[in-house]
Amino acid sequence: MNDAIYKSIKTLPPLDDTVVKIQQICRDENTAIGELVDVIKKDPMLTANILHSANSPLYGFSREITEINQAVNLFGMATIRGFALYGAIKQNFKINLDPYSLNSEQFLDIVSTQNALAFDWCKKLGGEFLNVISPASFLMEVGKIIIAKELIESGKADEFKKAFDEIKSLKELSELEISLVGVD
């Protein structure tokens, strides 16, 4: 692995206490959803983000969701865990995805849409894998933040962006990232 990428990963900011508590609660099979709601209520920004998402057409809930306990019950612990991770990314990362021709708003929209798709897909399959797939859907694009940072710092962003505009497949994207940054 590229040393600069390794250092970037090692220096990522720690998760805040709310996110850590949510992670712990969601890992404990004996935890009641009420405990999760209590932790979320202490974080107004997370509460607002969850309620905003619950009322987004992406999730297709049939009525307006006004209470955080309603949203937590509808989404379930796994998706709430993902929202907490998403909020941590949004708050703690300086997102500059210019090499990928994305701004932070577009990036966060992609992450949110991926989670909505994962949520719907898992629900149709009975929700069995939601505890893994939902948080993963939020995190799978984080590598782009780190790679973009390395491209910018190493002076390869323009070269990457020019080649990126010609990319036609994920395989080609992976090959480009490997060739310029040295990771896959």
Where are these regions (language model features)?
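Conserved alpha-helical "signature site"
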Residues: 1-184
